[in-house]
Design a protein with these regions (language model features):
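Active-site-proximal loop/turn and secondary-structure-junction residues that shape catalytic pockets
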Residues: 143-147, 190-194, 235-239, 277-281, ...
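Acidic (Asp/Glu)-rich catalytic clusters
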Residues: 46-48, 87-89, 123-136, 177-181, ...
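Catalytic-face loop-and-helix region of soluble metabolic enzyme cores
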Residues: 261-365
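Conserved, mostly hydrophobic/aromatic
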Residues: 169-170, 231, 273, 334
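N-terminal basic, low-complexity leaders that serve as flexible interaction/assembly modules and, when applicable
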Residues: 1-92, 360-361
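Active-site-proximal, glycine-rich beta->alpha crossover segments in alpha/beta enzymes
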Residues: 89-179, 185-211
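Aromatic-lined glycan-binding groove of carbohydrate-active enzymes
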Residues: 213-301
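Acidic, His- and aromatic-enriched active-site or binding-groove loops in soluble protein domains
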Residues: 79-83, 156-174, 202-225, 249-261
């Protein structure tokens, strides 16, 4: 069984697929709660619902609510005390913490347990059988700044404590890469980037964009240099609701171009990027102006278009054509705006079916 990595596909790799397989399908990672628990069955679900279609990766996320289980678990960390309690039913109901006086955090306190989870997933993966080659296992890696921000509830505290969160994340990444090498790809996941820019006045964007890009670049620089990454930008999807309204793609493009510049300076390859183009409450826009910023995206950035919305299939088809017209090239892959963890099972099935249809759709550019 061979391993295919699509973060930086060559033309030969794309041509190796069937002539109609213009794009791959990308899954952000999570599945509805009723489908989680059994690693083998979760991975089988992704394979069974994408027949004759290339996948960018094979995920197996354990928390359908992304980091909520981890966030709740921080209540047991002795160095922390709650500032606000909550059940995470929505963004106003999330717990936050502060450091107890005279205490400090260790990276082990903040571990997401990704290394142990990945070992279990890879053991289950070895029992999978399919006629096609499997893509690499996709490991969900929340951005350290996001973890710090959700923990403390304020940007200032998040920046202050960022180093220990970064170390906790990278401990897992290095362990996983050492154990599994190129059989895994890492997906850095961040709603905080776009949420921060949404809350920042546009005259201050240049400084904010540089700071955010520098933070993300540091993660890649301190990780294994031969690891394969991709990036998942996000509007948030707790309760299938976004953190902020959909406006345009200018923030995403400005951040990604700044990150590209930082990584180029460090001689680190730019990962493929999942850009959300709809939300749990907003259909993919059909106004061409929404996608216009994509013409300014660096041409060597591979785009995963997060525009597959099973409740708006016509708009999804239109959005794909508009996005590729502005990019002047086919996207690497199509995807939903976020994971399927907040969907009902029939909706997840419908989304996967629409993604496969769009993946095989003839490119217009």
């Amino acid at each position: 069984m061979s391993t295919l990595v699509f973060s930086h596909p060559s033309n030969d790799q794309l041509d190796a697929a069937s002539s109609e397989d213009v794009r791959a399908v990308h899954f952000v990672g999570s599945l509805p709660a009723t489908l989680t628990g059994d690693h083998h069955q979760m991975m089988r679900w992704f394979l069974d619902h994408t027949p004759d279609t290339t996948l960018t990766g094979l995920p197996c996320d354990q928390d359908p609510r992304w980091i909520i289980d981890w966030l709740d678990g921080l209540a047991a960390i002795d160095a922390l005390e709650p500032v606000r309690t909550g059940h995470s039913a929505d963004y106003n109901d999330m717990p936050t913490y502060r450091l107890k006086h005279g205490r400090w955090l260790e990276s082990d306190d903040l571990s997401l347990g990704r290394a142990t989870h990945t070992d279990a997933v890879m053991a289950a993966r070895a029992q999978l059988h399919d006629d096609r080659d499997f893509p690499p296992h996709q490991v969900s890696i929340p951005n350290p700044y996001d973890l710090a921000l959700f923990t403390f509830g304020s940007p200032g505290a998040a920046v202050t404590h960022l180093p220990v969160f970064r170390q906790a994340v990278l401990d897992d990444v290095h362990t996983i890469h050492r154990q599994h090498g190129n059989h895994v790809v890492f997906q850095l996941e961040t709603p905080a980037v776009l949420a921060t820019l949404d809350r920042t006045p546009r005259p201050l964007w240049p400084a904010a964009v540089r700071a955010l890009a520098k933070q993300v670049a540091r993660v890649f620089a301190d990780g294994p240099r031969d690891a394969t990454w991709r990036i998942h930008l996000c509007y948030g999807d707790l309760g299938h609701q976004p953190l902020f309204p959909l406006t345009d793609l200018v923030p995403a493009v400005q951040f990604l171009n700044a990150l590209h510049e930082q990584l180029n300076r460090l001689r680190i390859p730019m990962p493929a990027v999942h850009i959300p183009m709809c939300t749990g409450t907003d259909a993919p826009p059909t106004d061409p102006r929404f996608y216009r910023a994509l013409r300014h995206l660096r041409r060597d950035i591979d785009v995963i278009a997060g525009l597959v919305d099973e409740t708006h299939p016509t708009e999804s088809r239109t959005a794909l054509a508009l996005a590729e017209t502005e990019l002047d090239r086919p996207v690497l892959a199509v995807a939903a705006a976020c994971g399927h963890g907040r969907r009902l099972v029939p909706d997840a099935v419908a989304n996967a079916a629409l993604a496969c249809e769009l993946a095989h759709r003839t490119a217009v550019c």
